[in-house]
Amino acid sequence: MTFLEELKARGLVHQCSNLEELSKKLNEKSITLYCGFDPTSDSLHVGNLIPMVSLLRFKKAGHNPIALIGGATGLIGDPSGKNQEREMLLEDLVLTNSKGIGQQLEQITQSKIVNNITWTKEMSVIDFMR
């Protein structure tokens, strides 16, 4: 069974543009992938379990997973598929939450941990749009 077949058998593949091409890439060489984590709380929760286990599976299969903390996107807020926008969090709270989640992710995922606030905080709107 290939790595992708294992993921599919476990119900971890919902949609893919080209399963054949993805399978080929996964079997040919190591890939780098990321999974995002929202800093809406100071701790991970049960909803983060499957993404974290998936990162571990990719690591075990020889790939390079990255856990991405959404420090910048957490400051913006989003509708989260709801009828109303998520409550805007203060910058200090997002920073605290990001640190807490980052420490937990380091212990659990064996992945590189990055925070998108690192490369977006000083970026101008023009630079972002370009």
Per-range role (PLM):
Residues M1-R130:
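NTP-dependent nucleotidyl-transfer catalytic core
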